Amino acid sequence: MRKGIYHLVKQIVVLFYYLMCNLCPVKQNRIVFDSSLGKSYSGNPKHIYEYLMANGYDLNWDCIWFYENEKYNIPGMSRQVRYGRLRYLYYMATAKVWVFDTRQPEFLLRRKGTYYIQTWHGTPLKKLALDMEDVFMVGESDIDSYKEHFTKNVHTWDFLISQNPFSSETFRRAFDFHKEMLEYGYPRNDILFWENTTEGIRSFKRKLGLPEDKKIILYAPTWRDDE
C-alpha cells in the first residue's frame, strides 16, 4: 500500500514538472543554485553565486537557492525555495541556467533553452562512476544500474567545471562526458589564492588561535556518504 502511494505521488510530481516545462516559458534572467541537493550552502555553487553578487548581477538576475530543511544565511538578493516542493519544480522548469554540484533526480530533464552547469564537488583521486567496480552509497547497491543512471544524468550536463588537465581527463572517462569542459579551477578554491598573502596567512592563524611561526598541516580525508 505504502509503495503504491509512493509511486502515485512520484508520477504526479513528474507530470507536474513536465506540465511546467510545456506551459511556462523559460525566464531569461533566472538562475537556480543547489549544493548537495539542498543540504548546504557551500562549495562551487556558493562561490559562483557570491561572485555574481559581488559584481551586482543578483540585482538583475533572479537567483534562486534550493534548501532542504531550514533556510540559509545567504547574502544578496537571492530567494530561497524548499527542495522537492512544487515551487521547486516550477523554478527548475523555468530557469535559464542550472548551477549544481551533484547529480539531480533523473526525471528532471533539462529543457530546450536551459543551460546546465555542473560544478562537481571534488578532485577525482578515488574511482568515480564508470571507473568504479563496486558501489556503496545510500540508495545504491547494483553497480550496473548505478552506472546506467549516472550516464543518463551526465548526458543532461552542458558544461562541467574542472580543476586541471588530470581532472579533465578523468572526468571525461569516468563520466562519459563529451561536451564542454571548463578547465578554470574550482570557484571555491579562489579564496586560497586571493588571501594567500603574508598578512592573509597571519590573520587566518590568529583567527584560529594557531602559532604564527609554525607551518600548519591540514588532514582532511574524503567524505563518504555511507559513513
Model-derived segments and spans:
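N-terminal pre-catalytic "stem/leader" segment of glycosyltransferase-like enzymes
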Residues: 1-86
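A short, charged/proline- and glycine-enriched loop
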Residues: 24-31, 113, 212-215
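Short N-terminal targeting/anchoring amphipathic segment
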Residues: 31-34, 90-102
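Conserved catalytic-core segment of nucleotide-activated headgroup transferases in glycan assembly
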Residues: 40-54, 174, 187-227
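Glycosyltransferases and closely related glycan-assembly transferases
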Residues: 50-58, 93-94, 106-116
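Short, hydrophobic beta-strand segments that form beta-sheet elements in well-ordered domains
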Residues: 60-68, 97-100, 160-162
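Structural alpha-helical scaffold elements that stabilize or flank donor/cofactor-binding regions
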Residues: 90-92, 109, 153, 210
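Active-site-proximal region of nucleotide-activated glycan assembly enzymes
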Residues: 101, 107, 111-199
